[in-house]
Amino acid sequence: MASSVGNVADSTGLAELAHREYQAGDFEAAERHCMQLWRQEPDNTGVLLLLSSIHFQCRRLDRSAHFSTLAIKQNPLLAEAYSNLGNVYKERGQLQEAIEHYRHALRLKPDFIDGYINLAAALVAAGDMEGAVQAYVSALQYNPDLYCVRSDLGNLLKALGRLEEAKACYLKAIETQPNFAVAWSNLGCVFNAQGEIWLAIHHFEKAVTLDPNFLDAYINLGNVLKEARIFDRAVAAYLRALSLSPNHAVVHGNLACVYYEQGLIDLAIDTYRRAIELQPHFPDAYCNLANALKEKGSVAEAEDCYNTALRLCPTHADSLNNLANIKREQGNIEEAVRLYRKALEVFPEFAAAHSNLASVLQQQGKLQEALMHYKEAIRISPTFADAYSNMGNTLKEMQDVQGALQCYTRAIQINPAFADAHSNLASIHKDSGNIPEAIASYRTALKLKPDFPDAYCNLAHCLQIVCDWTDYDERMKKLVSIVAEQLEKNRLPSVHPHHSMLYPLSHGFRKAIAERHGNLCLDKINVLHKPPYEHPKDLKLSDGRLRVGYVSSDFGNHPTSHLMQSIPGMHNPDKFEVFCYALSPDDGTNFRVKVMAEANHFIDLSQIPCNGKAADRIHQDGIHILVNMNGYTKGARNELFALRPAPIQAMWLGYPGTSGALFMDYIITDQETSPAEVAEQYSEKLAYMPHTFFIGDHANMFPHLKKKAVIDFKSNGHIYDNRIVLNGIDLKAFLDSLPDVKIVKMKCPDGGDNADTTNTALNMPVIPMNTIAEAVIEMINRGQIQITINGFSISNGLATTQINNKAATGEEVPRTIIVTTRSQYGLPEDAIVYCNFNQLYKIDPSTLQMGANILKRVPNSVLWLLRFPAVGEPNIQQYAQNMGLPQNRIIFSPVAPKEEHVRRGQLADVCLDTPLCNGHTTGMDVLWAGTPMVTMPGETLASRVAASQLTCLGCLELIAKSRQEYEDIAVKLGTDLEYLKKIRGKVWKQRISSPLFNTKQYTMELERLYLQMWEHYAAGNKPDHMIKPVEVTESA
């Protein structure tokens, strides 16, 4: 604030002396000499103005006003006196009076520069920014070379956000006075605000070069270097500032922040403590000290520091947010939410708090509200990469894959070194089947952040999917060690429960992984504060019927529906009332239509996204037994089961493992799949089906495969049943229309050990190689879709989608006679064809080695695999060549529509099951095609399903107890053709006569198990193992 001291004329030099003393700050001496002069010249207004200014500087406002008033009395037109009086009013907070006096001074003296400067300051204090700008502009109109005033105008424009105008002011000030360090520093601030970091650094460095003692410029330089993450130079700038002002607490705090970013946590902690020592009421320093303590693992002390910061400043938003983070990590979700909301109440534009709150809301299943807060975070901070990445996670959970992809991509554009975003993007690629892209993104994430368990374990799974076994053993060891450490520290393991079966983990680890995911569901439902449901103790309200609820996201075109779609309609309506709860929208397929039509009640819970309300609906339906068909597969909503809307809850069919969850009572399984001696692997009680827990609806979906005919393909005197095969509903009528059809009897053993096979021969229709057979073969060779023979439509087995797409998907039964040949798939006519139609991730190095050993022992044999995925093919071929197999010994085919997939299984001689994780649905598919399957049960549920299927089928001779026995069984089938024919005949016969595909008998056995569960519960008992199943027959 400029005081006007006037001009004092005194021949004695007394006035000149008083002026020098005033300028030097020696106000006491200046006042003494002014008073002496005033007594000599009472009418000297210059002396009065100087006295007014002296008293103002000494904060003696009343005396200052007194002398200004005396000067005005002496000269009412004295502008300087009015300006000095305005200064007094401004200092007292009487802004309007101050402004009026400044304006009066300017009316008296329009070129009064100090008057404009003082008026500008008062207008700023009064909030009239535009008026202040005009005051500075007026001053500069009278003297354009006032570089300090122009710099002050620049500061005001900068504060108003008018950065370009501010920049012009600073540049003009520098042009006027190139060595004006303040303008260089202020210009650096503008460039920093505009994101021009390097220009900002340049201008701050120029400022300190011009003025090596310019404290603020060193602080600004340190700040911008810190933001640019040029930490060594930032440290140097802050240390220089501290050499100028050793007790500057804020600089100590900023320097500590740089040490923290450099990972020098102990040094950061010491420096924060020094800042607090210098300024005990420094909430920012307490908050940042807490951050460093938390990083070091001193969580309790960190929590104390956050609380201290909040005691000093209850509205300290950063401390509220960071304390909320601690509460969240401690599992105190409600307190975390309260603190996040408080932080936003204090500071609504707090982007990080919006993002953190959104993350917790997402964890609670409140996805729409989470999405809203992520959008707010991004609105406030458009370059908030974390918010984009986390919003992508929410959109992914909401099944908006494209939206998630865009979010992750934007996060990476903002911050190319953002490892989490690369990992999240990889997961989108992985879920979309773009495995090479996923692998590349996971590897980028790990380069950026080598200690990144989620990225490592997901990369391991991707490499498993494409059979990339580089450093396989080391990878498995590291993966196991990661899981061990995470379980020890009570963290959510990076291996998903559904993938745990693929790795050499202990049973305890697999169960613990599932348990952690089950606990996540409990965390989500705890926030709902729903009181426990009251459950029925009897069947009175349901007219004596047991109400069973099947919950699945797979009621549609999905392998689970292919297996069980007939069961809801086969329940005894007198004893059971069936509810099907869909977790996914209608996909428009006949699979969905069938379940909807045949269940007593079909409820689409995908339209009730709130888990609490969905569970209420299930409870209102009075369900007695609620069946979980998803486990931890895609689309699951285990939170519904965590709320326990039914008294009995059971796992069944859709998930090959334990839930690890206390809210699941039973797992429906069988003695072969889950032997009683390994019951500790399961959190649930074992509930045994009498034969196998697995079932397939193949007899209903593919009845045209119950019979087949072959075209006479002779080699070495044998008639082969799988070179050129015809199937169809009207097959018998078609064969009756043909001349010379032969019936060849194929001997096969029965389901037991009966050596007399004469009574179990199967009749195989054989069409001789005549003009009709040649027409069929020509259709195949020429790639025709369909021909007509004797009024029957004969179709190319590769063209089912072109003839009837619903038949191709298995939704309808094909109405034509379908021809399937080895030549269609490039399979050798005269070779033994081993097959496996599983996804390639189920093959591990030891499995491929067994396959290679078998092929080497069986001359003229091949292994038929699927491009599932296609990118796995070159890896398998390369490893096979390394094992000594020529490339032509392994043949790949594309994945086919469901009906073709099942039907073409007839062309193989033997299926080699994958011991790591069996073919479950694919096992049923290949057995329905009549092809024997060799398996070797392991220790996990997923590795024992095929043995269960074969046991039910009565084909124990195909179950190996060791790798050597597995190879020997496969080799015998490939070298002893008579034995192969017998086993193929047995499988062909047993698939019809055994319980394996008998859905009606299976449903009755399942009902018996449900009644056991209910009777046990109704008697007041807790769930217990049910390992002595009651067998029923179809006539029962």
Curated annotation (Swiss-Prot):
Q: Which GO terms describe its cellular component?
A: cell projection; cerebellar granule cell to Purkinje cell synapse; cytosol; euchromatin; GABA-ergic synapse; glutamatergic synapse; histone acetyltransferase complex; mitochondrial membrane
Q: Where is this region: Required for phosphatidylinositol 3,4,5-triphosphate binding?
A: 981-1000
Chain span(s) of sequence motif DFP motif: 454-456
**Superkingdom of the source species:** Eukaryota
Q: Which residues are named in the active-site annotation?
A: 498
Query: Is Lipoprotein found in the keyword set?
Result: no
Tell me what effect the entry lists for residue 989 to A: Reduced phosphatidylinisitol binding
Give a yes or no for keyword Mitochondrion in this entry.
yes
Q: In which tissues is it expressed?
A: Expressed in brain, heart, liver, thymus, muscle, lung, spleen, uterus and ovary; in the kidney only an immunologically-related 78 kDa band is present, which is also present in liver and muscle. In the pancreas, expressed in both exocrine acinar cells and in endocrine cells of the islets of Langerhans.
Q: What catalytic activity is recorded?
A: L-seryl-[protein] + UDP-N-acetyl-alpha-D-glucosamine = 3-O-(N-acetyl-beta-D-glucosaminyl)-L-seryl-[protein] + UDP + H(+); L-threonyl-[protein] + UDP-N-acetyl-alpha-D-glucosamine = 3-O-(N-acetyl-beta-D-glucosaminyl)-L-threonyl-[protein] + UDP + H(+)
Please name the PROSITE patterns in this protein's record: TPR, TPR_REGION
Outcome of mutating residue 498 to N: Loss of glycosylation activity. Loss of ability to reduce mitochondrial motility
Give start-end ranges for motif Nuclear localization signal.
478-493
Question: Which residue positions carry a glycan here?
Answer: 3-4, 389
Q: What is the effect of changing residue 986 to A?
A: Reduced phosphatidylinisitol binding
Q: Which residues carry this modification: Phosphoserine?
A: 3-4
- Domain notes, please? The TPR repeat domain is required for substrate binding and oligomerization.
Q: How does it assemble?
A: Monomer; may exist in different oligomerization states in cells. Homotrimer, oligomerizes via TPR repeats 6 and 7. Trimerization is not necessary for activity in vitro, however it increases affinity for UDP-GlcNAc. A heterotrimer consisting of two 110 kDa subunits and one highly related 78 kDa subunit is isolated from liver. Component of a THAP1/THAP3-HCFC1-OGT complex. Component of the NSL complex at least composed of MOF/KAT8, KANSL1, KANSL2, KANSL3, MCRS1, PHF20, OGT1/OGT, WDR5 and HCFC1. Found in a complex with KIF5B, RHOT1, RHOT2 and TRAK1.
Specify the protein name.
UDP-N-acetylglucosamine--peptide N-acetylglucosaminyltransferase 110 kDa subunit
Classification lineage? Eukaryota, Metazoa, Chordata, Craniata, Vertebrata
